[in-house]
From Swiss-Prot:
CDD domains: ATP-synt_F1_alpha_C, ATP-synt_F1_alpha_N, F1-ATPase_alpha_CD. The gene is atpA. This is ATP synthase subunit alpha. The keyword Zinc does not apply. NCBIfam families: atpA (TIGR00962), PRK13343.1 (NF009884).
């Protein structure tokens, strides 16, 4: 038997040297987990005991995942990418980071996915850093009251449902009622502010497309490019073909990009089109993660899903740079049911809502805004003084017209005042019609609404109202300084009113109706006063009631 050639002292010295050479700082440990099952954009992972909520983890094939459910024996993970290659038993590791996206002015004019990667084929994007998706909204003391106007260029909205910078204004209605059209018109209307070069006027726009058809997103981009609005707009696209996890994250990506500009003292407009599809995607993810369902199978925290997103829209205080982010979330209803779960949630979170009615849309009243139930809770303080002055009675007149119109269907004889009110209401309703992608500057809106509410259009046939408006504005641009004065002062002075009055009266002498007749020869309808017996009969009926 061979003898041991190493003495005990040598063994002891070798062990001692090895122990003394150990440096704790150079040692590293890595938590490793394994995939239990995967499918439908979700994976369940065993291991990783130290993982944090919303931490990024990496699968062996390089795919990223977002840790959501932290349970005793496993983790529920949203797969951020192609999940077909993730198999049972695959190794998973922690990154120690939360999900973030690159931000900066390089994103203007680009189309990106919910992870901030460009998908428009125009190369890489130069970024100015990264910003976490889950950011705390500004606190009460970090905010300032909404006081600056955010013009949409749509007469019905700017006059009666004004929006201010930093406001959250919901656009709600059935499918195919023009919700996206209002949002796109609002983006296009910011072009003049952008071209002014004044950073206090410029508005950077973000359009977040959630669950839309790819062709729809392409048409939106095409419309913005044609209008020259893409240079100050970013599109975050999560089409219908994306996994549910991407649709859930897309609004937070857009919000993170916008917050970077907001905290830099700039103004941002963000459109979420639409949050109904985000809620449905979150419901799908939650059910796959085996979270307990609640009302309409939505998880219990679906209100928090939208509140923490929309609370990031704010007007910041002067100490923080006075930037703002205005939110226009869109919600799609079914059969005009605004009392459903998600619509009522978002209505309670936002600062007002614009209701679009399918009946009005089908009656060719476009934009199909129902002014009776639409409201802006904070935008009135931000409204331009000139438009505020001329539109003071507009909403009331339209409401009275709607109620009188319903009554007139059953009434054969109406008194002169009622017939006059019906005629005025029909012309005001026609005046509020507006073609898509044609936003009106605020000074033109003031002239149009002033002419309508002051009775200047009462002699114009209803079918000629829009042509009269168009030709009147051309006449004012060419022959007077009324529009330039309104644009410069934003206040309706007595001198401007007198100038408008004379200019409109002069134009009415030149205008010809669709039948080729001068407007002066048409005249307004002569309303006969109600007969005495009719008045007495009406009083008898009221007395019996």
């Amino acid at each position: 038997m061979a003898e041991l050639s190493i003495s005990p002292d040598e063994i002891r010295d070798a062990l001692k040297d090895f122990v003394q050479s150990y440096e704790p700082g150079k040692a590293s440990t890595t938590e490793v987990g394994y995939v239990l099952d995967a499918g439908d954009g979700i994976a369940h992972v065993q291991g990783l005991p130290g993982v944090m909520a919303n931490e990024l983890i990496t699968f062996a094939d390089g795919t990223l995942g977002l840790a959501q459910n932290l349970e005793e024996s496993e983790i529920g993970v949203i797969v951020l990418g192609e999940f077909a290659g993730i198999e049972e038993g695959m190794e998973v590791r922690r990154t120690g980071e939360v999900l973030s996206v690159p931000v900066g002015d390089g994103y203007l004019g680009r189309v990106v996915d919910p992870l901030g990667n460009p998908i428009d084929g125009q190369g890489e994007i130069a970024n100015e850093g990264r910003r976490a998706l889950e950011l705390q909204a500004p606190g009460v003391m970090q905010r300032k009251s909404v006081h600056e106007p955010m013009q949409t260029g749509i007469k019905a909205i700017d006059a009666m449902i004004p929006i201010g910078r930093g406001q959250r204004q919901l656009i709600i209605g059935d499918r195919q009622t023009g919700k996206t059209a209002i949002a796109i018109d609002t983006i296009i209307n910011q072009k003049a502010n952008w071209e002014s070069g004044d950073t206090n006027k410029q508005v950077r726009c973000i359009y977040v497309a959630i669950g839309q058809k790819g062709s729809t997103i392409a048409s939106v981009r095409g419309a913005l490019e044609e209008a020259g609005a893409m240079e100050y707009t970013t599109i975050v696209a999560s089409p219908a073909s994306d996994p549910a996890g991407f649709k859930y994250l897309a609004p937070y990506t857009g919000s993170a990009i916008g917050q970077h500009w907001m905290y830099g003292g700039k103004h941002v407009l963000i459109i979420f089109d639409d949050l109904s599809k985000q809620a449905e995607a979150y419901r799908a993810v939650s059910l796959l993660l085996r979270r307990p369902p609640g009302r309409e199978a939505y998880p219990g925290d679906v209100f928090y899903l939208h509140s923490r997103l929309l609370e990031r829209c704010a007007k910041l205080s002067d100490e923080l740079g006075a930037g703002s982010m205005t939110g226009l979330p869109i919600i799609e209803t079914k059969a005009n049911d605004v009392s459903a779960y998600i619509p009522t949630n978002v209505i309670s979170i936002t600062d007002g809502q614009i209701f679009l009615q399918s009946d009005l849309f089908n009656a060719n009243q476009r934009p199909a805004v129902d002014v009776g139930i639409s409201v802006s809770r904070v935008g009135g303080d931000a409204q331009v003084k000139s438009i505020k002055k001329v539109s003071g009675t507009l909403k009331l007149e339209l409401a009275q017209y709607r109620s009188l119109e319903a009554f007139a269907i059953f009434a054969s004889d109406l008194d002169a005042a009622s017939r006059r009110q019906l005629a005025r209401g029909a012309r005001l309703t026609e005046l509020l019609k507006q073609p898509q992608y044609s936003p009106f500057p605020i000074e033109e809106q003031v002239v149009s609404i002033w002419a309508g509410t002051k009775g200047k259009l009462d002699e114009v046939p209803v079918e000629d109202i829009l042509r009269f408006e168009r030709e009147l504005l051309d006449h004012l641009h060419r022959n007077t300084e009324v529009l330039s004065q309104l644009k410069e002062k934003n206040v309706l002075t007595d001198d401007i009113i007198d100038a408008m009055d004379k200019a409109v009266d002069r134009f009415k002498l030149e205008f010809q109706t669709g039948e080729g007749k001068p407007l002066a020869s048409v005249g307004s309808e002569k309303f006969e006063p109600a007969k005495a017996e009719d008045v007495n009969q009406e009083q008898i009926v009221k007395g019996k009631r």
